Amino acid sequence: MTRHPSRPTPQTIPRSDAAARGLEEPAIETVLFDTHKWVGFVAVVANGIAGIVCLVAWRVVRWRGRWVWILTIVAEVLFLFDVVVGTALVAAYKFKPPGIHMFYGFLVFITVGLAFQYRESMRGRTELLYGLVGLFLMGLGIRAVFQVV
């Protein structure tokens, strides 16, 4: 019967040795890029849903309520967050997006700002305004995705 040599006691790997042994955590730019990609997809879908819900709420009074505005705000904030993450990728990590991808992000910020500015002048038709804005943002997002894919 042969004896197996005893295993060495496990030791914690110092941070500096982690990369040498292949145990490196993903780089922050990889995490930001994946976040930008997936939040972008979610924001496109969320703005499409929010746009349709707002248009239905404009026509059907029963549908109006706080939940419509919460959905709309969450959808728009997702897009704004996605634009900020994309801006961080370009500014800090020198990512070069193709075509006019960055222009679509700029348009998202402008559109959300203009919609917020015009909400007072659209009293009684605010759901219509935000429904059209949600669908427009969805279209911008789809165009931005097709610039990359």
Kindly label every feature range from the protein language model.
Residues 91-95, 113-128, 145-149:
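Membrane-helix boundary connector in multi-pass membrane proteins
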Residues 59-68, 119-126:
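Membrane-interface helix-boundary motifs at transmembrane edges
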Residues 24-48:
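Hydrophobic transmembrane alpha-helical segments in integral membrane proteins
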